[in-house]
């Protein structure tokens, strides 16, 4: 499932209005929906929105083995370069990795 579809599904399942969802994400309603309707949003934007809704992204190997690179360093580089989410995901997939979206642990 594409990240935008995941976010829209979360909004629908929680019965949120566009304005409510935007407020949770810390954006104006127009800006929020512009980001989602772009269909190829920036990685930084998607991680910010997912975080606001209580989700996080991890990189996992398709074969289930342990990552052979530092996930934190990868995310720092992705944030610095401000890449498109789908482009970054396509690179990972070509290398045998996937993005996995999961609920953040309760504090």
Q: Where are the regions that the model predicts?
A:
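DNA-binding alpha-helical recognition surfaces that contact promoter or target DNA
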Residues: 5, 9, 23, 34
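Short alpha-helical DNA-recognition segment
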Residues: 15-30
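Short, basic-rich loop-to-helix N-cap that marks the start of a DNA-contacting helix
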Residues: 38-51
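Short, charged recognition helix plus adjacent turn
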Residues: 60-107
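Intrinsic low-complexity tandem-repeat regions in disordered proteins
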Residues: 46, 56, 88-89
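Recognition helix of helix-turn-helix/homeodomain-like DNA-binding domains
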Residues: 26-41
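The alpha-helix within a helix-turn-helix
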Residues: 11, 22, 50
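A short, Lys/Arg-rich alpha-helix, primarily the initiator
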Residues: 1-16
């Amino acid at each position: 499932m594409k990240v935008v579809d995941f976010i829209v599904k979360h909004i629908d399942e929680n019965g949120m209005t566009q304005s409510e969802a935007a407020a949770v994400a810390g954006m104006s309603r127009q800006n929020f929906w512009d980001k989602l309707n772009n269909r190829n949003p920036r990685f930084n934007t998607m991680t910010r929105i997912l975080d606001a809704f209580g989700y996080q992204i991890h990189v996992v190997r398709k074969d289930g083995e342990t990552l052979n690179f530092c996930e934190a360093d990868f995310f720092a580089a992705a944030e610095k370069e401000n890449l498109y989410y789908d482009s970054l995901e396509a690179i990972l997939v070509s290398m045998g990795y996937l993005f996995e979206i999961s609920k953040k642990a309760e504090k």
